[in-house]
């Protein structure tokens, strides 16, 4: 419990550091912005790293992403408040990871696109998986959720385009690694964790780009539900998905999107 309190306090401190008085307004106006969190302008993705200054905390670091007006928001500020999901997930009783994911994506810290999805997918799966287990086999979520958050935060924004590996799909592998206690020296679990990520990446890739963090998160979660049932023998609830945010994505693929319209 101490660790949970520290995470919540830390999230509050980080949010305060990243948000001055004038920044509160943009947060309220752009809680689900599909583009720049500062001005709403379209994002630009560069070919090479350029040193940029975060418009919120003013930290300078290399990045390939900014908006057309030059605004850059670092991953730390972009995901401020993310640690609050620990309390949410500990109180959650659903065995449906899509339901858990939707609750987290509805919070102000989650934007249309962004590296927060690299954490949320794994956290939703871990929570629903644990709820689907018999009481005698339950995990220690108070320890495992912060681990998922820590690992997910290491996957940078734009990994789908710049590394050829969608962070939402990688998050399924993070989830699998945590529940199987996998390490680089493991044998059977090493295979399972990499296979999980590969299956999710395949599903994401088959639907093509441009990226949509919402679509790719849904696809990754649904793939993981089937994978866990087959390989771990644990059955989570699998809900039908119909995205309610398609119109907020300027680069959406329209009728080609498997989770828009009639859903999947």
Where are these regions (language model features)?
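C-terminal motif of bacterial Sec signal peptides marking the signal peptidase cleavage site
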Residues: 15-17
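Residues immediately within or flanking Cys/His clusters that coordinate Zn2+
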Residues: 33, 51, 64, 71, ...
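Conserved phosphate/anionic-ligand binding catalytic regions in large, soluble enzymes, centered on
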Residues: 117, 158-178
